[in-house]
């Protein structure tokens, strides 16, 4: 898929879709063969547990709030203006441990199956089903007891 020229407005999706996944809200910002980006809205107390992208590098550009991150075996924080780099195969997860929402622009390269995964996860409430469907789309979650601290 080629990249179309244009602007995707803040808080909107290039496709008009909004995905709600376990408390988070995602808007697709662009999609082409080489990459896929999405804006996240993460209410206070939400998180995405540690996982690995087996075929994609992932990035987070923090727009608002604070991200507590598990990244390659270490705990760290990212703030507005920070860019987080998560190479493929490196365990990572993010948490909003504050009392305010956070927002960020995420993107992966190559695009892979992530957009299709979000379409399948929309409105699911069963975390086990999220893990199962994610694995079929090259995203492998770590076991809950695999990460200490944080």
Where are these regions (language model features)?
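Conserved hydrophobic/aromatic beta-strand scaffold that supports enzyme active sites
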Residues: 28, 37-39, 59, 75, ...
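Ligand-binding loop in jelly-roll beta-barrel domains
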Residues: 68, 88-114
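Basic/polar N-terminal segments that are highly enriched at the extreme N-terminus
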Residues: 1-12, 147-150
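Acidic/histidine-enriched, glycine/proline-rich intrinsically disordered or flexible terminal extensions
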Residues: 115-150
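Hydrophobic small-molecule pocket/channel-lining residues, especially in calycin-type beta-barrels
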Residues: 46, 67, 116
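Short, conserved beta-strand element in jelly-roll/cupin
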Residues: 39-43, 52-71, 109
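A short glycine-rich, His/Asp/Glu-containing loop-to-beta-strand
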Residues: 15-50, 56
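Short acidic-glycine-tyrosine-enriched beta hairpin
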Residues: 9, 73-91
């Amino acid at each position: 898929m080629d990249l179309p020229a244009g602007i995707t407005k803040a808080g909107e999706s290039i496709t008009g879709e909004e995905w709600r996944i376990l408390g988070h809200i995602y808007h697709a910002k662009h999609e082409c063969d080489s990459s896929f980006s999405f804006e996240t809205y993460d209410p206070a107390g939400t998180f995405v547990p540690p996982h690995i992208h087996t075929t994609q590098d992932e990035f987070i550009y923090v727009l608002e709030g604070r991200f507590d991150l598990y990244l390659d075996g270490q705990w760290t924080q990212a703030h507005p203006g920070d860019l987080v780099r998560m190479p493929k195969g490196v365990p990572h997860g993010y948490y909003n441990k504050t009392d305010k929402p956070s927002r960020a622009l995420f993107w992966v390269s190559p695009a892979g199956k992530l957009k299709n995964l979000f379409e399948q996860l929309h409105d699911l409430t069963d975390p086990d089903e999220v893990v199962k469907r994610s694995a079929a789309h090259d995203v492998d979650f770590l076991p809950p007891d695999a990460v200490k601290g944080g």
